[in-house]
Amino acid sequence: MLTLSDLQSLCHEAAGRISPHVRHTPVEYSHALSEVSGAEVYLKLENLQATGSFKIRGATNALLSLEAGATGVVAASSGNHGMAVAHAARVAGLYPLIFVPEGAATSKVEAIEALG
């Protein structure tokens, strides 16, 4: 069974692994949300990442954790996940193959192509 200490260790390892490859985004206090909720609300501005979302963190950690010898990665997405996998594959030195649904917005397809 995974203990809290084990989980903390795994999180610290992941943070160290991805740190050179992701932006260190700010945390900002939200007066409006704090007032509405009656609690102190802080926002982690992951929209400032290279891919525009937090998904770059998980994708980068996963691809940098692959066993030696991996040469590529496959994903299916027309959005943030596809962009994150394409970016992380480039960081990890892997070939990304991202399947995008027919009819996906051209801007999203171009963003994925630009990243990987």
State where each predicted segment sits.
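PLP-dependent amino-acid enzyme catalytic core
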Residues: 1-116
